[in-house]
Amino acid sequence: MTPQDFYRTLEKDGFLLSSKQKEQFDTYFKLLVEWNTKINLTAITEKNEVYLKHFYDSIAPILQGFLANEPIKLLDIGAGAGFPSLPMKILFPNLEVTIIDSLNKRISFLTLLAQELGLENVHFFHGRAEDFGQDKAFRGQFDVVTARAVARMQVLSELTIPFLKIGGKLIALKAQAADQELEEAKNALCLLFGKVIKNHSYQLPNGDSRFITIVEKKKETPNKYPRKAGLPNKKPL
């Protein structure tokens, strides 16, 4: 998917990018490739692949109608090189984006990237989701939490749901069907008062299958969740 293909595909979906937005995506690509030689951000560095498998894939929840261009408080867990939240932010500038990542070098990259792209209302924090999930400044504060290829739903639910307001939504982007994952996550979702409201499949323009699972938070998360760092992964609910 060349940049021009990317623009045309978005235009067909009703999103006409401004010259500023096109420049932002171009700068994003260049900085991603440059920084990838210093720290491991991605295995995908070929331009057409980045536009398809990172940029287009990241904004899929918007293209599929699951997010609006409003001042929604959005948290991205384990965003790595900023996916999916920063491409979303470029497309929908009104989003207020917070990223938590456990690697400080990635936070350094994201901070510089946001400055170079001229993004406002973006915040970056270094640390573990389990620790921030028990911090009152973060817990129960977000309308949406996004996670792209972070963990199985059984683990992911404990890392994300505590951050949501009641009625808030987890948007999980997956490369594989989540049916088996959701079956395994039933107990975790029950304990965390999360309900799967959508399990959506779609295709990238090259025909690759992708999946979006949306979980709504129904009640306050019990105080004991999330458990200490590492436990959700070692002993899933």
Swiss-Prot record:
One of its GO terms (cellular component) is cytosol. Signal peptide: none annotated. Gene3D superfamilies: Vaccinia Virus protein VP39. CDD domains: AdoMet_MTases. Its main location: cytoplasm. S-adenosyl-L-methionine binds at G78, F83, A129, E130, R148. It is found in: Cytoplasm. GO terms for molecular function: rRNA (guanine-N7-)-methyltransferase activity. Coiled coil: none annotated. Its EC number is 2.1.1.-. Pfam families: GidB. It comes from the Bacteria. Keywords: Cytoplasm, Methyltransferase, rRNA processing, S-adenosyl-L-methionine, Transferase. Belongs to the methyltransferase superfamily. RNA methyltransferase RsmG family. HAMAP family: 16SrRNA_methyltr_G. Specifically methylates the N7 position of a guanine in 16S rRNA. PANTHER family: S-ADENOSYL-L-METHIONINE-DEPENDENT METHYLTRANSFERASES SUPERFAMILY PROTEIN. This is Ribosomal RNA small subunit methyltransferase G. It comes from Streptococcus pyogenes serotype M2 (strain MGAS10270). The gene is rsmG.
